[in-house]
Amino acid sequence: AWDAVHGLSESFQYYLLKASNEIAKEKGHCENFGRTKYADGILPIDTYKKDVDEICSEELQHDWESLRASILEHGLRHSTLSAQMPSESSSVVCNATNGIEPPRDYLSVKKSKKGPLKQIVPSYGTLKNNYTLLWEQPNNTGYINIVAVMQKFFDQAISGNWSYNPINYEGSEVPTSVMANDFLTTYKYGWKTSYYQNTHDQKTDEVEPAHPMGWHDNVEDVGIQGKTRLDNLLEELDNSNEEECESCAI
């Protein structure tokens, strides 16, 4: 998984920079470009925390040196280009998951000014066995590594999160040592900032919050009475035509 994230993140940043450089050739670089590290030919691949290579040691696949030379000559039309933010409001519109955050469940029910909205994870019928739900994760290792590998290439800080399910620990209590280790590990692997520390409250609510860390943008949680409706809905999707749109079906 880390290798795939590494390749995608590298291409993401490389082509963002390449496109901005091409625009700069045509229209000139952005105002105050000289105040950026890019103006000195410094790229994210030069400044990332080298401990990340313990997670993934994949070689770079793009010609960064030619791009560096072109940036030094022509500049960039943008001072920054990449960020990884939660996308809750837009995810409702396009039926997507919330950025890189694991979904809390396959089905969420949210309400907006226009009324309750049912949202199923994308391609549930074909990808249901490939989703890792937030509270099914045994620990934060996988998530920490993914954010670290992405941060290697991004030129803005990613705010990551830690999530804990008490049932995974003796006495249903998350040890302080576990949380401290996660904190130190994120620092070691180059996290710039952290955001929320989530703890599963074991409620039987079958929906994920409007934002996995509790922030609401005109979208609030709506409870579902019992589990039967969810089971019936997912069973219906299992038996539906794969070509049908899950969002439209519900």
Give the residues covered by each predicted segment:
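Extended, well-ordered alpha-helical scaffold/bundle regions in very large, multi-domain proteins
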Residues: A1-D51
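Catalytic alpha/beta core of large soluble enzyme barrels
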Residues: K25, H29, D46, D53-Q61, ...
